[in-house]
């Protein structure tokens, strides 16, 4: 299927979305962590912790963190879940280079590694991972169905998928407040701190366009996942999706 956010690109209507997303994240990588925590008022840390807590009972030993960015989720997951191996994948080397430095400082280089991967065409073997996580990156996929299908392929039978994604609140007054915040505050702060005039206009557009709630639950189910559930966090600003292969 085609989804509205797949047509939204950071810089130009011409060219591949994945290449423009890679360029965008390479550009904003140095300022990304500061911006992320500032724009979410630090609440993003609690969202990550909720996602990781859901995985704890399953004790996954081989984990892939898709769209790993600067490695925040990977580092927290490694501390909390104590896996044998965690591979962070992303299309942006700029983001992963920041992540590599953070992992080194945490003393986790033997457990966490990074690999440049396009999630619509992963290089890993079938049934490779016990768990796959995606935090705030799935709406940037050039092809959502392909990305989910590839994650399904490399996940072991009985393995678990966890997705965190920013969503649009659907109730008054948070819906109205979030609209103002995403249209004015996010682009203004983004331009100021990242020096990229397009990135933080693109991101709110993709949040609004991305399928959410029951619609996203059905998208995940269609590629083969079972026991698909979702939970809205912080008045619907973020949604946690969980599924099993």
Swiss-Prot record:
Molecular function terms, GO-annotated: demethylmenaquinone methyltransferase activity
GO aspect biological process, one term: methylation
CDD domains: AdoMet_MTases (cd02440)
Enzyme Commission number(s): 2.1.1.163
Annotated catalysed reactions: a 2-demethylmenaquinol + S-adenosyl-L-methionine = a menaquinol + S-adenosyl-L-homocysteine + H(+)
Cross-referenced Pfam families: Ubie_methyltran (PF01209)
Record's keyword annotation contains Transmembrane helix: no
Binding site for S-adenosyl-L-methionine: 70, 90, 118-119
InterPro entries listed in its UniProt record: SAM-dependent_MTases_sf, UbiE/COQ5_MeTrFase, UbiE/COQ5_MeTrFase_CS
Protein keywords: Menaquinone biosynthesis, Methyltransferase, S-adenosyl-L-methionine, Transferase
Disulfide bonds: none
Key word Methyltransferase present: yes
Domain of life: Bacteria
Pathway in which this enzyme or protein is active: Quinol/quinone metabolism; menaquinone biosynthesis; menaquinol from 1,4-dihydroxy-2-naphthoate: step 2/2
Function: Methyltransferase required for the conversion of demethylmenaquinol (DMKH2) to menaquinol (MKH2).
Family statement: Belongs to the class I-like SAM-binding methyltransferase superfamily. MenG/UbiE family.
Protein name: Demethylmenaquinone methyltransferase
Organism: Bacteroides fragilis (strain ATCC 25285 / DSM 2151 / CCUG 4856 / JCM 11019 / LMG 10263 / NCTC 9343 / Onslow / VPI 2553 / EN-2)
Taxonomic lineage from the root: Bacteria, Pseudomonadati, Bacteroidota, Bacteroidia, Bacteroidales
